[in-house]
Amino acid sequence: MIISAASDYRAAAQRTLPPFLFHYIDGGAYAEYTLRRNVEDLSQVALRQRVLKNMSDLSLETTLFNETLSMPVALAPVGLCGMYARRGEVQAAAAADAKGIPFTLSTVSVCPIEEVAPTIKRPMWFQLYVLRDRGFMRNALERAKAAGCSTLVFTVDMPTPGARYRDAHSGMSGPNAAMRRYWQAVMHPKWAWDVGLNGRPHDLGNISAYLGKPTGLEDYIGWLANNFDPSISWKDLEWIREFWDGPMVIKGILDPEDARDAVRFGADGIVVSNHGGRQLDGVLSSARALPAIADAVKGDIAILADSGIRNGLDVVRMIALGADTVLLGRAYLYALATAGKAGVANLLDLIEKEMKVAMTLTGAKSISEISGDSLVQELGKSLPAALAPMSKGDAA
């Protein structure tokens, strides 16, 4: 199969993975309206082509939280990453490390912090959820610090899990789920051999280490359902600073006022994100939400963005809309499922090449030169027409 884009990796991953795993990462909440709009809205952002600008000294390098990145991209936290390739977190981290960008380990990873961190030179980032079990949160923070993690990504848009209807149909949940997953694995021998047999243990490494016992997929589903804390507020986050003195990023911001609250709280960064369309269906796409948030807090806090980014052109679009750096989630997981570390490395190379083409043809020699001026402004609006808020007439 010819691989020339992330979309090729998606098709390959669908053939390789058992349906319960493919649809778990590919799907979204409810009718998946926001999932689709994440991609569609971003693809409609029109870039302003410029020519004869002498682009011979173009650079993608940028700095974030006193770290130098080879390009403004980091790998996002993805749960169960180790179910998509043998010890998947280790392989993805290695690809990111070789490229010179951060890897973010999920709370609900298969490989624990202590397994991943020693395999890479660059300090990795660690993602943590807001949970009822404060003892687990404290333990995870202490372990992340001991392992040399540099940045905490605190996910706040999951006070309760979203309703993902695909999971019940695919076998991730629903009637006879365990039996359905077993037969799906039998029908996908490449995955069954590489991950099902040779990728063990399939524990949730960070949770097992705290609970002192193995944890499987059923434990994962039950633990998540029982531990998210809907009572959390900004004030409750203050105690985290007692245990974490490094950069802290608040992930899951879609409203300018929440972005201002993050600044007041003293966060170092935010991630403009709707959790990849996996939480609340019908909310704004990240591309629609980003410009207003950038207007509110740009310069006061680092702005990261995810959801809908599929290629290097999308990275440039997000930066032009106001992001400093982007996070890749699904795109890298498709590549990981297809070809492990080599797949992720190739995807990152493709994104780098696509970014260079986009920057060359928009006249931006550096990341700092990508701005709203890189976008086509239509009818005097401050946003591209594709992202302008709908009028009442449009909504009808």
From Swiss-Prot:
Its cofactor is FMN. FMN binds at residues 106, 127, 155, 251, 306-330. It is an enzyme of class 1 (oxidoreductase). SUPFAM superfamilies: FMN-linked oxidoreductases. It catalyses: (S)-lactate + A = pyruvate + AH2. The keyword ATP-binding does not apply. Substrate binds at residues 24, 129, 164, 278. The active site is at residue 275. One of its GO terms (molecular function) is FMN binding. GO terms for cellular component: plasma membrane. It comes from the Bacteria. It is found in: Cell inner membrane. Pfam families: FMN_dh. InterPro entries: Aldolase_TIM, Alpha-hydoxy_acid_DH_FMN, FMN-dep_DH, FMN_HAD, FMN_hydac_DH_AS, LldD. Residues 1-380 form the FMN hydroxy acid dehydrogenase domain. Keywords: Cell inner membrane, Cell membrane, Flavoprotein, FMN, Membrane, Oxidoreductase. GO terms for biological process: aerobic respiration; lactate metabolic process. It is a peripheral membrane protein. Its main location: membrane. Its EC number is 1.1.-.-. Belongs to the FMN-dependent alpha-hydroxy acid dehydrogenase family. Catalyzes the conversion of L-lactate to pyruvate. Is coupled to the respiratory chain. NCBIfam families: L_lactate_LldD, PRK11197.1. This is L-lactate dehydrogenase. The gene is lldD.
